[in-house]
Amino acid sequence: MAGYGDTVMDRSGDKPTLYTIGHSNHAIEVFIGLLKRHGVTALADVRSRPYSRFKQFRKKELERALTEADIAYVFLGRELGGKRDEPECYVDGEKDYARIARLPIFQEGLKRLDDLAREDTVALMCAEREPVDCHRTILICRELRGGPFRIRHILGDGGIEEHEETERRLLSVTGMEDDLFAQQLSPEDRIAHAYALRVRQLASG
C-alpha cells in the first residue's frame, strides 16, 4: 500500500504550515496564548487517551477552553495515537512505529489531518514539551516529511523550531551526528537510522 507521502507529493501551491505543540504543564491561558500567537485555528489532539493529571488538558475541559477561544478541537488519537491496541503493532512486546504507520486507520488519520489543514491552521498536540521526546515528531511528522506541510514545532517558551532543525537535533541526541558508521550513510539513511534509534530509546526510557 502506498504511504501517505506517496499520495500527496503532487499537491500544488505553497505548503501550508502544520504546527506541533506539547501541552506539558502550561496554564491553559498560557497554552492558548501560544496557539493564538502563531495563528492556530484548530487543534488536533493526537494523544491516544485524552486525559491528563493536569485537569485543564483533560478532553472535556480542554475542548471547552478552546471553543471559548474560537479554536476548533479535533480528536485524532484513535487514528494517530502512539499507544496502540492492535497486536500487529508490536514486535517482542515493543511498539514498532513502522507497523503503526502502515495501519489503514493511521493513514485515514493523515488524510483527515490533510483535509483539516485545507481549512484551518492546525497544531498537532500531545503531552511532551520536547518534540524529539514525542510520537508527534518521531511517528507522525516522520510520515509527513516530504509531504504537503511545512512542519514547525511550537516550543515551551513560544519559540518556533523548523522541523529540519528538529531533525538535526535528533541526529545529535541519538549520537548519529558523530557516529563513524553513520557518516558513511546518505543523509536520508542517517536520519532514518536516527528516527529508528529514537524509537528504541524512548521505549527503553
Model-derived regions: residue spans:
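Residues lining hydrophobic/aromatic ligand-binding pockets adjacent to catalytic sites
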Residues: 2-205
